[in-house]
Amino acid sequence: MAPLKLYGMPLSPNVVRVATVLNEKGLDFEIVPVDLTTGAHKQPDFLALNPFGQIPALVDGDEVLFESRAINRYIASKYASEGTDLLPATASAAKLEVWLEVESHHFHPNASPLVFQLLVRPLLGGAPDAAVVEKHAEQLAKVLDVYEAHLARNKYLAGDEFTLADANHALLPALTSARPPRPGCVAARPHVKAWWEAIAARPAFQKTVAAIPLPPPPSSSA
């Protein structure tokens, strides 16, 4: 089988989300760089893959997909028998759907701006906007309080097994180790910390992070 092609930038949270699931499945894929700084995502060749001009896009043979969460659902379903089962029958289907939605509507809207401010802007030669960081760090802390209460009763988001709901959060352990949005954002929440560390220890996550141009970690704890 020809390798799948994932179009995007390695540091994009949405690209990392898909790369993590591809690695969990043990699938052969290549990242085809799309340079947002030069407007490559708005050029006709990329718009043919995603008419909205956003990364990522995935090409799997004749199948062309965009929207990272839809891509991940496709991968988890089409390649269900390969690698990690991300939609296990033993997981609570209701919890899985709830936490997929939570990631999309509560977690990502606050975590993604932090990734941009704390990781992407410095790599592009800019400085983080302190006001934006503080705003989203405060909101993310409130979201993580909800996670802490839930994870006090569950090892993973949908129960005792790692699922697609957990995989969709993959960039954030990298964020908190490389540039924590505020001191103790994870360390002060022991159940979130244990969940974070379980994700970060997974070989698929480590393989994904190895391809991300992260800045060196700070000396203080997340």
From Swiss-Prot:
Domain of life: Eukaryota
Coiled coil feature spans: none
Protein family (similarity comment): Belongs to the GST superfamily. Phi family.
Signal peptide extent: none
GO cellular component: cytoplasm; protein-containing complex
Quaternary structure and partners: Homodimer.
Residue ranges annotated for the GST N-terminal domain, each copy included: 2-83
Binding site for glutathione: S12, P13, N14, H41, K42, Q54, I55, E67, S68
Annotated Gene3D superfamilies: 1.20.1050.10, Glutaredoxin (3.40.30.10)
UniProt function note: Conjugation of reduced glutathione to a wide number of exogenous and endogenous hydrophobic electrophiles. Involved in the detoxification of certain herbicides.
Gene Ontology molecular function: any one: glutathione transferase activity
Enzyme Commission designation: 2.5.1.18
GO aspect biological process, one term: response to herbicide
Family annotation (SUPFAM superfamilies): GST C-terminal domain-like, Thioredoxin-like
Taxonomic lineage: Eukaryota, Viridiplantae, Streptophyta, Embryophyta, Tracheophyta
Catalytic activity annotation: RX + glutathione = an S-substituted glutathione + a halide anion + H(+)
UniProt xrefs under InterPro entries: Glutathione-S-Trfase_C-like, Glutathione-S-Trfase_C_sf, Glutathione_S-Trfase_N, GST_C, GST_Phi_C, Thioredoxin-like_sf
Keyword line: Transferase
UniProt-recorded name of the protein: Glutathione S-transferase 3
Sequence ranges assigned to domain GST C-terminal in this UniProt record: 89-219
